Amino acid sequence: YCTDIGLRNAKLNFRQQEETHIMENIMYNELLCRGYFVDVGVVEFVNTKNGKKSKTQVEIDFVVNAGSKKYYIQSALNLSDDEKMNTELRPLKNTNDFFKKIIVSKTSMKPWTDEDGILHLGLYEFLLNDHSLDL
């Protein structure tokens, strides 16, 4: 991740304007500014299809630690359809613990918690509210 998105863009001659990567980078920088320790996580689970088992690994964008608190955070530019929603939620649903799970999307919305206990936040709420992870 880059510390300064503007310098990143200038170094790349403004050729790679991938909004998803820029959003994730901004979120990473914000988490560091708030004093969190930030890692990337991997969740492994077993799929059974046609009687055959296979292991699948999926990434959690951010595993955020602060003292005894831990948060799993997914960054998603948009969650416009069920397939995209399921892709982003799958890593969070397959963690085998009870730490807080959060998905942040660019969509402007009021924070809400789904039936699986996953907090859904808009990007602006995440960035502008220093306590957004504890809503």
PLM feature spans:
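A cross-kingdom feature that marks ATP-driven nucleic-acid transaction machinery
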Residues: 1-135
